[in-house]
Structures are given as structure tokens and as C-alpha cells.
Amino acid sequence: MLEFKDVSYSAGGKDILKNVSVTLDDRFSAITGPNGSGKSTMAKLIAGIIQPTDGRIFMDGVDITDMSITDRANAGISFAFQQPVRFKGITVKDLISLAAGKKTTVSEACSYLSEVGLCAKDYINREVDGSLSGGELKRIEIAMINARGTKLSVFDEPEAGIDLWSFNNLIKVFENMHERAGGMIIIISHQERILNIADKILVLANGGIVDYGRKDDVFPKLMDVRSGCYFTKN
């Protein structure tokens, strides 16, 4: 369970999040809203990349507000960036071992790659460099998160910068993660297909919460108001 209590965040004289209070308690939650609504800021606050100006953040009842990124990672929080980092000179197997916190066998690493739809023999010894596409990198990143076995996995707009074929594969990966999830998954996204596989949807606009509830209640309203009138929180 993740809880925001009166959380605000300001930068450069601008209020980006304003007194946000919400409890995310389902296995798979999606956060959506127009550009500049505070979605990515909320994700970075969860991961500890930035600290709130005001308010507190709790995970499973523990105050994590002042924890560093490392401490949050050790507490079971993982974060996937919009653009995964490339590591020249490090193989996919090495990266999975680093994520798992132990030396993984070839069989174990191959299992994690297979879970995200990658042919293990084609990737296990490849370097995580510019030869990999955006879609391949994102799936390798998800394999790392699965290897780590985190309590809370946060994905910031995972569909960004990938082609349609890679996106379709990514949807299948998230559907499988949803079915097998041992922890919470939070995805920041605009994509209807991602929103449609969430348990709950949180809608942000102008730094505040417009709506939050079960997917079956919130999703139809989002589809009816793509003109923008839904996102009118002052």
C-alpha cells in the first residue's frame, strides 16, 4: 500500500503538485492526465528522485519521505525511466545479476528474459548499448525488475519512444505481470490500452486529483471526454 498525505511539490516558483492525498492499494494502478499535470513528478517522488516540498509519503505504513533512492530500492521500490539507460561494456546477464543482488545462472537469466518475450539466446550475452532498440531496452529493464522481486514497481510512460510492434509486445508483458504480480505496479501513461488493464486509475490535472477509482468506473469517463473538459481542476 502506498499513501500520499497532503503532498505538494514546487520547483522554479511553480506549484507542480498541490496537497495530494491518496492511497494506492491495488496490485496494478495507472496514473494519467494531460501533459504537465504532475504525473512524472508523482513517480519521481515515489522513487525518491525528488523530495516533496510538503507532506509525507508512506509505504505499508512506513514513512519513506526522507529515505534516499538507495534506501527505497532496498525497501523494495523500483523505478523504470521513460528512456532506459544504456550500459556499454555490460552484458544483459550482468545487468540482471546486478538487479537480483546476486550472481544469477544462465538458466535464471534466460527465464527472466523469456518472461518479457525476449529470446534468451539472442540477448543473454549482448551488451546493453546502442545496438538495442527502445522496445528491447524497456523489456530488459522489466526483466531486471522481475529479477529484483520488488514490492512496488513504478513505470514512467513506458510507451515513450517505441514503435507499434514493440508497444504491442510491451502490453503483453504488462498483462502477464498483472496476472502474476506479487507486489504493486504503478504505471504513468496516456495509452488507453495500458489504462484498460489497470485495476484502478488515478487522474491528475493542474497538480491535483480529478478522479480516482476502479478502472470500470473511471475509464469510460476518460474515453468520453478526450476533448479536455474532464481535466478542469483549479
Regions found by a protein language model. Name each.
Residues 55-62, 108:
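Conserved ABC transporter NBD signature motif
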Residues 208-231:
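Conserved beta-strand-loop-alpha-helix hinge in the C-terminal portion
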Residues 154-158, 165:
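Walker B catalytic motif
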